[in-house]
From Swiss-Prot:
NCBIfam families: Q_tRNA_tgt, tgt_general
Gene: tgt
One of the protein's GO biological processes: tRNA-guanine transglycosylation
Renumbered residue ranges of the record's region RNA binding: 251-257, 275-279
EC number(s) recorded for this UniProt protein: 2.4.2.29
InterPro entries for this protein: TGT, TGT-like_sf, tRNA_ribo_trans-like
Protein source organism: Campylobacter jejuni subsp. jejuni serotype O:2 (strain ATCC 700819 / NCTC 11168)
Keyword Transferase: yes
Family the UniProt entry places it in: Belongs to the queuine tRNA-ribosyltransferase family.
UniProt-recorded name of the protein: Queuine tRNA-ribosyltransferase
Binding site for Zn(2+): C308, C310, C313, H339
Length: 373
């Protein structure tokens, strides 16, 4: 992976990242394709309508079904999905933690029950990389020990100890595998844990900074803490992160979260929010969000957002979308998802432009002004 820090405006950054499959600028938002597809959309939509340069797939789900061996047989995620740009795959640790009622965390790894058939599985620092080697993802995430917030100081310390231990195992294993010709062209990111505890976050960041990861992620946020505490945690980490590596805030978030955390030096984001909200009838716009199911939209001839150039806004009225949603027409999911993802990707583009023009502060002011804040 090639990484170039191109420009800074305060702590906000524009960087260029090149993987084996695409080059993209940050800040970047990565649409989430949990089971190898962004819900209701295909590779053509992602490339031709949205021009997404990188998307995320989930190791937990793809490991269980169809299994990594099946994906490998199709030539990895790129051959399986026909999306020939970059893939980032998470380690599956979050889903093992959140979807399995009886998951157990040990120093060896995470034991969990499949949400599909109840079978038992063990994720270890090595096994999740083996799975991601089969996927041939461009960016692989290591296994980390996530804790729900609020958590006791003792549990947070255990989480950081374990995450550092697993990071050492993962980076050593990855280097050994590359020496054997496996994982060539695949990059590995470490994950910083520590809850909202300043000292534990700092300890984890300093430890992982010493390891030769291609990038560093901030995990374990947006899991129950107040937004202000999330922003403070990210800002406090900034001095301890290597400036010459990508910074990825996992699972975040709202448009406001993106703006606030770009201001605090974050480069990469992913979240299911744009597509999940789309399926529930909620649209993101330059003036805020609204739900299309309201009766006031039945005879509305306007498009979702007159400033938007997405496929949906170029072609369809609020009245038509209101009808599709109420009729439970599957077409609605695609049209709504296209709009919301276009909004997120365009928000990232506008932030890049503002940073390059040294006008991010003004951009943020206008962003909130349009929302009446």
């Amino acid at each position: 992976m090639e990484f170039k820090l191109k420009h800074k405006d305060g702590m906000a950054r524009v960087c260029e990242i090149t993987t084996a499959h695409s080059t993209f600028l940050t800040p970047v938002f990565m649409p989430v394709g949990t089971v190898g597809a962004v819900k209701s959309l295909d590779a053509n939509d992602m490339k031709n309508e949205l021009d997404a340069k990188i998307i995320l797939a989930n190791t937990y789900h793809m490991y269980l079904r169809p299994t990594s061996k099946v994906v490998k047989d199709f030539g990895g995620l790129h051959g399986f999905t026909k999306f020939d740009r970059s893939f980032l795959t998470d380690s599956g640790g979050f889903q093992a933690f959140s979807l399995s009622k009886n998951s157990k965390h040990f120093n060896e790894g995470i034991e969990f029950k499949s949400h599909i058939d109840g079978s038992r599985h063990l994720f270890t620092p090595k096994s999740v990389l083996d799975t991601q080697y089969d996927f041939n993802s461009d960016i692989m995430m290591i296994l980390d020990d996530l804790v729900a917030l609020p958590a006791t100081k003792e549990r947070v310390k255990i989480s950081v100890d374990r995450t550092i231990l697993w990071a050492k195992e993962a980076i050593t294993y990855h280097k050994n595998m590359q020496n054997k010709g496996i994982g060539i062209g695949q990059n590995i990111f470490g994950i910083i844990q520590g809850g909202t505890d300043y000292e534990e976050r700092k300890r984890c960041a300093l430890s992982l900074n010493e390891m030769p990861f291609d990038g560093l992620a901030i995990g374990g946020l947006s899991v129950g803490e107040e937004n202000a505490l999330m922003y403070e945690t990210v800002q406090n980490l900034n001095p301890y992160l290597d400036e010459n590596r990508p910074r990825y805030l996992m699972g975040v978030g709202t448009p406001e979260d993106l703006v606030e955390n770009v201001e605090r030096g974050v480069d990469m984001f992913d979240c299911v929010m744009p597509t999940r909200n789309a399926r529930n009838g909620t649209f993101f716009t330059s003036f805020g969000k609204f739900n299309i199911k309201k009766a006031e939209f039945i005879n509305d001839h306007e498009v979702i957002d007159s400033t938007c150039s997405c496929y949906t806004c170029r072609n369809f009225s609020r009245g038509y979308l209101n009808h599709l949603f109420k009729a439970k027409e599957l077409t609605f999911f695609r049209l709504a998802s296209l709009h919301n993802l276009h909004y997120y990707l365009e928000l990232a583009r506008k932030m890049r432009e503002a940073i390059l023009n040294n006008s991010f502060t003004q951009f943020k002011r206008n962003f909130y002004h349009l929302r009446g804040k």
